[in-house]
Structures are given as structure tokens and as C-alpha cells.
Amino acid sequence: MTEKLKNSKEVIAYIAECFPKCFTLEGEAKPLKIGIFQDLAERLSEDEKVSKTQLRAALRQYTSSWRYLHGVKLGATRVDLDGNECGVLEEEHVEHAKATLAESKAKVQARRKEQAQKARDEEKSKPKTKKAPQQRRANKPQAQKPAKQPVETRALNADELITGKAVNVNMGKGNMAATIVEINKDDVRVQLSNGLQMVVKAEHLRA
């Protein structure tokens, strides 16, 4: 018996493997043909790994991702499952994608602020414990702790700016580990270790 795929992420990876000229897992995604769900359902109707419900949910997740919405722009062409062109995007679809992308980014930003505020509130609500007075020691010099050495990083070379490269993002107060997901001239999309994605300038990336 064929084992069904467990979630939308696995389904997206599977259909990208079956239809590589239409679906991608990295870089800018291509706008999909209108009605592609029906084509997909027909082509995979005999496939026991995936159901129509899973396909519909996976398509919804794929087309609402920032990577896909970035690819919906004026002049871009829709493609079918085999990568054949199916007409240029209409302006109203481009504007809708822009609005959806802006709304999605605003929600993420609001969620981050809410989490940061919650963390601050929890910190304030913690009971403060009074430190017991330290007994003075008779003229015993305290051993100095060795200073913590900062992790040394360096600026990335141009040939190191590749998708999948593990890098550090300079966040001002320190570096955060990340992986390069997409490169668009000087703008680089990275995924942080906590799963969040963000666009930064190449000059802020370090090895």
C-alpha cells in the first residue's frame, strides 16, 4: 500500500518533483495557469500518494507564499504543468498579489511586535529576588574572568552569494545565523534559524 504524503510541505515537494517546469522549491516562483488545480487533479488522479483535498491545500499554501507573490508582476507569464506559457498576467492580478503580500508582511510584523511585548510583560511580572549581602573577604584579590571572545566574522565575497549558503546576518546588536533563499541583485532573502524569512542588503551578510 502506498503511503500518503503527510502535509502540504511534502505535497509541494512532490508536485515540484513531478512538474519541475511549473513548480519550484527555491528562487522566484512562476505564476500558475488559471485553473491549474483541475489539471493537477486529473494528472494525479491515479496517484495514491496524494488526494484532491491535499492538492488544494498545498496549492493554496504555494500561491500565498511570499516567494510566489514576488513572482506575480507585470510582464510575467503564467505557465501550465509542463512549463508552457499560458498568457501574460493581468494588471488586476498583479495588484491583488501586491496587496496580499503587503498584508501578509504586516501581519508578520504585528505578530513579532506582539511577541516582543509579551516577552517584556512577562519579564516585568517576574518577582525580583533580593540578593543576600556579600560578606567581605579580607584583602583576597578576586580572580578576573577571561573576557569572552566575540565570534569573528568577515564580509561575504561576491562568489559566496549563492542560494543555500549558510551566513550570518548583521542585526546591529549581533549576528544571527541564516540561510540564503533568494538573491535579487543587492537584495538577498534569507531564512533565519527560527523559520522567519526577511530581505536584507548583501552588505549586511557575513561569513
Swiss-Prot record:
Question: According to the UniProt record, where is the region Disordered?
Answer: 100-156
Location within or outside the cell: Cytoplasm
- Provide the GO biological process annotations: post-transcriptional regulation of gene expression
Which keywords label this protein? Answer: Chaperone, Cytoplasm, RNA-binding
Q: Name the chain's protein.
A: RNA chaperone ProQ
Keyword Membrane carried by entry? no
Give the domain of life. Bacteria
Homology family: Belongs to the ProQ family.
Described function: RNA chaperone with significant RNA binding, RNA strand exchange and RNA duplexing activities.
Q: Which residues form the signal peptide?
A: none
